[in-house]
């Protein structure tokens, strides 16, 4: 299944819904180009991986490279709704400790809006 990337925006945040495998070839090239293009427009991106059935080593490298590209531009990429297989790959490789991972896109969006601290009396 080729990778399809649906980009939307909410609250100034780019949301990329990935559908299909993130594997060596056009898939990783498309994802890399999409993320780099979005980083020219915004400092906040959420990658939704709910519909990603497989990530190979090149796909994993692309996710890490995208994360680093964002960080180098003082931007943030957060991950949301990982499919069971995506969660497994990120967990086995310990990459999930590098990324901020949220159960849903909504939670990832909210994480960009820190709650005000309570007043101290």
Predicted segments with their positions:
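Residues that form or immediately flank small-molecule/cofactor binding pockets and catalytic motifs
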Residues: 12, 84, 106
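STAS-typified acidic loop motif
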Residues: 4-33
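A charged, well-structured terminal subsegment
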Residues: 101-121
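General small-molecule cofactor/ligand-binding pocket signal
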Residues: 6-8, 80, 102
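Intrinsic disorder/low-complexity segments
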Residues: 15, 87, 119-120
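Amphipathic alpha-helical interaction surfaces in cytosolic regulatory modules
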Residues: 23-99
